[in-house]
Amino acid sequence: MQFGPVPLDQAEGAILAHSVPLPNGRLRKGCRIGPEEIATLRGIGLSDVIVARLGPQDVHEDAAARTIAEALVAGQTAGLDLRPVGTGRVNIHVAEAGVVGVDAARVNALNAVDPMVTLATVPRWQRLAAGEMAATVKVIAYGVASASVAAAALAGQGALTLHPPRLRTAALIQTVTPEDDGGSGHRAIESRLQALQVALQ
């Protein structure tokens, strides 16, 4: 990937590296520079701009993040949702309550592939309610080598799984004493089960 200042007449098709303040807002970093953006930049008196330009073996940050995120949930037919990609980031949320399985060895292997590719997850067996986030894939640069994308996807394949509860009701057996009627323990267990959409009978 090439990175640095270029004259405006050479900037078309490149990626804007830094946000540029405008009288009525700003031109956001990461946007693809076209004729309209060049005209806007000229209009505020700029003659050059700092850009990133992907090489033939580079993958755009959004496409790279999506490819890696899809590999993470490979084999998981339901339960893990990939949210829309943006600025090189894909958040992975759970579609239903459950506990998240995380293969730490695969996560560590993925994070060792390229410093421009990162994965963060909740702890293994974290209990999550429907809609909560389980992991984030982030490509830090505007683009990353296709070889790194392929290696990261392979390293992290199937690293995330969701395990929803198999039962929808549960019974609690408690030992109580005259000093403790078990109410606080009952409420604590009930709250944890409710987070998994399991009713305590």
Task: Label the model's feature ranges.
Residues 1-87:
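Short, low-complexity N-terminal leaders and the immediately following helix N-cap/first helix
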Residues 23-24, 35, 59, 100, ...:
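Residues in flexible loops and secondary-structure boundaries
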Residues 50, 91-93, 171:
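Structured core elements
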Residues 55-167:
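Extended, charged alpha/beta regions that create polyanion-binding interfaces
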Residues 140-201:
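Phosphate-binding glycine-rich loops and their immediate beta-loop-alpha structural context
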